[in-house]
Amino acid sequence: KEVKQGDQISLPNDPSNEGRALQLLAQNKLITLKKGVASPTIRDITSNKLNLKFTELDAAQTARSLNDVAVAVVNNDIAAAANLKPANAIAVEKITSQSKPWVNFIAAKSSKDKNNATYKKIVKAYQTKRTAELLKKVYKGSTLPAWNYKF
């Protein structure tokens, strides 16, 4: 599918996900954003050559909005629940240094626990090829094992 002049696009309306959605649109050259803004909003769009129209919705509603808009930017967990597959997407977020804020991680309550042997075993048990395969299967490619990336 190609994005056309004047198409309506639904975006998540919470600050983190809206910024991430706009960055995805910018990565795909549909809009240009003001430089240096970590969590952009639609007010930070500096160029919109296709005159795209934006509808901000609760993130949980973006997949359902596909019946009413040309394009929706949908978070991976919501996409998986709606049976949307990354292979059918017109764009998928690229893993870059900008992705770091959205990486899930295993954390200890205190930095003094950083070297706790039990916690290290949990991390080792989680960061396996089998877990990576399960992530791919369950999330149909929309969630990736972050331990394979250097940020």
Where are these regions (language model features)?
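Periplasmic-binding protein-like
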Residues: 20-26, 125-147
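Alpha-to-beta junction loops
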Residues: 7, 30, 50-53, 67-74
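Short amphipathic alpha-helical coupling segments at ligand-binding clamshell hinges
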Residues: 114-125, 134
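A conserved helix-loop-strand patch within extracytoplasmic ligand-binding domains
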Residues: 1-31
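Solvent-exposed loop/turn segments at secondary-structure junctions
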Residues: 15-18, 60-62, 77-80, 112-113
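A bilobed periplasmic-binding-protein/Venus flytrap-type ligand-binding module shared by bacterial periplasmic
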Residues: 1, 102-118
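Short helix-initiation/N-cap motifs at beta->coil->alpha
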Residues: 37-64
